[in-house]
A protein has these predicted regions:
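Domain-scale recognition of functional cores that engage charged ligands
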Residues: 1-170
């Protein structure tokens, strides 16, 4: 029997509190991480910090630019966009602990034709890996606050890869 993700690896790597370290250039430099690596991490990981009672007032004031996610959760379960956050839910987040605040990274969008109508769908790209190797790359198309598989015309879409040397920036 193979469990994926491996429970031990999941416990080590899936906790979103790791993103607080990986998105903090000063802490990475103290740990001896090379500047080119820090630059790559900064480009790919939105600024993330743990939600603590000590930071509650500052995070509440900055909430419109943040997304709040359970540190140990996955998907969009119990995740809240800050500009839609109610004070009651905010109190639950602070009282319950175990959340991170992440700078909002707006998704890209693609125009698609559904039943002869043009529609703009948000998208994200996912790389599914096993044993350190990418097995599948897919796009998820959706409308709304978080990804879902209920959007008309949405769901999974293929991603066509090209060689990096063929890429010419616009």
């Amino acid at each position: 029997v193979v469990l994926t993700p491996n429970p031990h690896a999941h416990a080590l790597y899936a906790d979103k509190r790791n993103l607080a370290l990986l998105s903090d250039p000063a802490r990475l430099a103290i740990l001896g991480v090379a500047q080119p690596t820090i630059d790559v991490l900064r480009a790919g990981i939105p600024r993330t910090e743990e939600v603590t009672p000590e930071r509650a007032d500052a995070l509440w004031a900055a909430r419109r630019g943040l997304f709040f996610k359970p540190a140990a959760g996955f998907g969009s379960r119990a995740a809240y966009r800050g500009d839609k956050l109610t004070l009651r839910v905010w109190r639950d987040i602070i009282d319950g602990g175990g959340y991170v605040a992440q700078s909002i990274a707006l998704p890209s969008a693609r125009r698609v034709r559904i039943d002869d109508e043009d529609s703009d769908l948000k998208l994200d790209i996912r790389a599914y890996a096993y044993m350190g190797r990418i097995q599948l790359v897919a796009a998820r198309l959706y409308m709304g606050q978080t990804t879902n598989l209920r959007t008309s015309g949405g769901g999974f879409a293929p991603v066509f890869l090209t060689r990096s040397e063929d890429f010419v920036p616009a």
